[in-house]
Amino acid sequence: MAASAIQSSAFAGQTALKQRDELVRKVGVSDGRFSMRRTVKAVPQSIWYGADRPKFLGPFSEQTPSYLTGEFPGDYGWDTAGLSADPETFAKNRELEVIHSRWAMLGALGCIFPELLSKNGVQFGEAVWFKAGAQIFSEGGLDYLGNPNLVHAQSILAIWATQVVLMGLIEGYRVGGGPLGEGLDPLYPGGAFDPLGLADDPEAFAELKVKEIKNGRLAMFSMFGFFVQAIVTGKGPIENLADHIADPVANNAWAFATNFVPGK
């Protein structure tokens, strides 16, 4: 009787351990706390992923490196300099690219939209992106959207300190995995950051990742172009575009490059 009870107890213990291990395997565990994770396919069934994805090898690469397998969005198999050969460096660079892509998309919109509004009769102070911030050095200071009732800034140091604090909090929140370090993906956290549920379908989510990184790369090049335009022409992107349309021969990259004199 005692032997039967011991055997039953041992069997029950093994069953409980198996159930616990299965639960941990399904939902994950971090620092002694269980955290739910969305289950997704390892390689999405999309033309943009896998060995048969579209590739661009560039002029100096004969074949796709073995470490670029098409697992991640935006992988066209091009890495002539071998920047992604080390897995840790690759992971870090992917994170930096996605974050900078998002900032560039927001920045490009911020460079274009105020100038468009100004061209259509909306008055809110300086519309050219690289001139707007300089208003803080004027006697009247800087009014956000031209409205002194919103944010009236007169100290560049105060703006800098506020920026550091706010961005530090946001970046800490992201790197920490969400509120109280709940184990959210630092690049694609979902949840409250996806109120429309765009990532609920894994296949649609995989496609959106590709669209995001492609548009983000384009935005980074656009921002670089805006910087160069500001230095060379002293005008915003919309005004430069209007000048080019009005007189393409006199207003183009080649004409400005051949006539550009630094400091003038």
Curated annotation (Swiss-Prot):
GO terms for biological process: photosynthesis, light harvesting. The chain crosses the membrane at residues 98-118, 150-170, 218-238. It comes from Lemna gibba (Swollen duckweed). Pfam families: Chloroa_b-bind (PF00504). Residues 1-36 form a transit peptide. Chlorophyll b 1 binds at residue 56. The LHC complex consists of chlorophyll a-b binding proteins. Chlorophyll a 2 binds at residue 100. Chlorophyll b 5 binds at residues 163, 260. It is found in: Plastid, Chloroplast thylakoid membrane. One of its GO terms (molecular function) is metal ion binding. Its main location: plastid. Chlorophyll b 4 binds at residues 163, 174. Photoregulated by reversible phosphorylation of its threonine residues. It comes from the Eukaryota. Chlorophyll a 5 binds at residues 211, 229. Chlorophyll b 2 binds at residues 102, 151, 180. Chlorophyll b 3 binds at residues 155, 171. Chlorophyll a 3 binds at residues 135, 145, 212. Binds at least 14 chlorophylls (8 Chl-a and 6 Chl-b) and carotenoids such as lutein and neoxanthin. The modification N2-acetylarginine is found at residue 37. Chlorophyll a 6 binds at residues 244, 253. This is Chlorophyll a-b binding protein of LHCII type I, chloroplastic.
